[in-house]
């Protein structure tokens, strides 16, 4: 039996754990602290699948009809 991957579904946008350097750049660009980002629970199925842990920041890349590609950021919490 093959394992089902949430990330392969057409309705699920790309999720990835942000490298520290890229995260610092984004936080600086928006003049915010990591704790001010929107949150996502560590028990979220996609967080489990990508191996995110509490304190990581997940970058979500969505396809947008108006913007082309749009990036969103979420802080992983308990």
Curated annotation (Swiss-Prot):
DNA-dependent RNA polymerase (RNAP) catalyzes the transcription of DNA into RNA using the four ribonucleoside triphosphates as substrates. Coiled coil: none annotated. SUPFAM superfamilies: RPB5-like RNA polymerase subunit (SSF55287). GO terms for biological process: transcription by RNA polymerase II; transcription elongation by RNA polymerase I; tRNA transcription by RNA polymerase III. It catalyses: RNA(n) + a ribonucleoside 5'-triphosphate = RNA(n+1) + diphosphate. It is found in: Cytoplasm. It comes from Methanosarcina barkeri (strain Fusaro / DSM 804). GO terms for molecular function: DNA binding; DNA-directed RNA polymerase activity. InterPro entries: Arch_Rpo5/euc_Rpb5, RNA_pol_subH/Rpb5_C, RNA_pol_subH/Rpb5_CS, RPB5-like_sf. It comes from the Archaea. Belongs to the archaeal Rpo5/eukaryotic RPB5 RNA polymerase subunit family. One of its GO terms (cellular component) is cytoplasm. Keywords: Cytoplasm, DNA-directed RNA polymerase, Nucleotidyltransferase, Transcription, Transferase. Its EC number is 2.7.7.6. The keyword Electron transport does not apply. This is DNA-directed RNA polymerase subunit Rpo5.
């Amino acid at each position: 039996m093959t394992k089902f991957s949430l990330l392969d579904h057409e309705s699920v946008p790309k999720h990835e754990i942000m490298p520290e350097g890229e995260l610092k750049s984004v936080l600086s660009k928006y003049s915010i602290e990591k704790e001010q980002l929107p949150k996502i629970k560590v028990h979220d199925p996609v967080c489990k699948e990508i191996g995110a842990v509490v304190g990581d920041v997940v970058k979500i890349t969505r396809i947008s009809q108006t913007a082309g590609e749009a990036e969103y950021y979420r802080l992983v919490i308990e």
